[in-house]
A protein has these predicted regions:
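Gly/Trp-centered helix-boundary motif
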Residues: 1-155, 159, 163-164, 289, ...
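Alpha-helical transmembrane segments of integral membrane proteins
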Residues: 125-341
């Protein structure tokens, strides 16, 4: 692992000095790691089955009922009481801590949906009978992955546009600014809702739509940095020596611009997650049935008699966004040369 430069060591020290941001980063990483392992935590399939001396791995392979002594060739339903008794009597089963997946309905409950928290459903069930904890866990993974991909794609486009405008200036900068002014003046949320209502959205289509309108946040920052550094002596010397524009942009100017850019990334990630949550809450986000924090918020609004729905969804979104804001503040302070440990 390469050692950090003295400048980056000082930045890391300033970041660690901000205890709220430092621990928020660790908590966020733990939450994200748990969400990536959602199938091992909440799943309606066994993690491992030992049946009549053979090993079975339902998480990675589909088995039929005949594989476990059943009469049908259909896919095994591990929620079937008969199959559960069959597996337990002739072997043993390793289950996830929560025996419900993102779309598993708890038919065994005796209470109407949404049902309150219980020993089986830690946070209760939603209006469709799904386990709230499982849907929050899977929904958190989708939200973070969507936010990360939107942040990366929009940042790359924004940095590229800002670099070209700031480096070349003149007509390139003029026409680029006019395009951004027109594009940023459009009602983004309404356009996303309009496009989502015309085309049946999925994860990738929704990501493409939001990237289309979300790439302008970093253009101004990168453009300003390039306009500031383009007249520095070392840039003029590189031009005089015949260094290509590509090498000057990527090797000499972009690192300076990235210092300011990195401080915005946690806030862009926070905004990206908020965008997906808002679209899901309004009903124009992920397809129906997808685990979503926004959809749980909508269910909480429509089922005020079941406060556990709204409270669980609200706390999940609030904690996730608060962690990112605290991380962003710590990163901003760490890259501020005026601050000292």
């Amino acid at each position: 692992m390469p050692r950090l430069s003295p400048v980056n060591q000082a930045r890391w020290a300033r970041f660690r000095h901000n205890r709220r941001g430092y621990w928020s980063l660790w908590i966020f990483l733990v939450v994200f790691s748990l969400s990536l392992c959602a199938e091992l935590i909440a799943n309606d399939k066994p993690l491992l089955v030992r049946y009549e001396g053979q090993w079975y791995f339902p998480l990675v392979k589909n088995y039929s009922e005949r594989d476990f002594g059943g009469p049908l060739a259909t896919t095994a339903d591990y929620q079937d009481p008969w199959l559960q008794r069959q597996l337990e009597n002739r072997g043993w089963v390793l289950w996830a801590p929560v025996r419900f997946g993102a779309n598993t309905i708890n038919f065994a409950t005796t209470q109407p949906f949404p049902s309150p928290p219980s020993a089986k459903n830690w946070l209760g069930t939603d209006a469709n009978g799904g386990d709230v904890f499982a849907r929050i866990l899977y929904g958190t993974r989708i939200s973070i992955l969507f936010g990360l991909m939107l942040t990366i794609c929009s940042s790359v486009m924004g940095v590229l546009a800002g670099a070209l405008q700031g480096y070349y200036g003149g007509k390139v900068d003029l026409w680029g600014q006019r395009l951004i002014e027109v594009w940023s003046g459009m009602p983004t949320l309404f356009l996303i809702i309009l496009l989502s209502s015309v085309v049946q959205p999925n994860f990738w289509w929704l990501l493409a739509i939001t990237v289309l309108f979300g790439w302008m946040s970093l253009v101004g920052v990168v453009r300003a940095e390039f306009l500031r550094t383009r007249n520095f002596d070392y840039i003029r010397a590189a031009l005089a020596l015949g260094v290509s524009d590509r090498d000057i942009i990527l090797r000499h100017m972009l690192p300076n611009a990235m210092v300011a850019t990195l401080t915005f990334l946690p806030f862009i990630l926070c905004s990206s997650i908020t965008t997906l949550t808002s679209l899901d809450f309004l009903g124009f986000g992920l397809p129906l049935g997808s685990p979503s924090l926004g959809e749980l918020l909508l269910q909480g609004k429509n089922n005020l008699q079941a406060p556990w729905l709204g409270i669980a969804a609200f706390l999940s979104v609030a904690i996730l966004l608060s962690l990112l804001i605290f991380i962003g503040e710590a990163v901003r302070d760490a890259f501020d040369p005026a601050r000292a440990v």
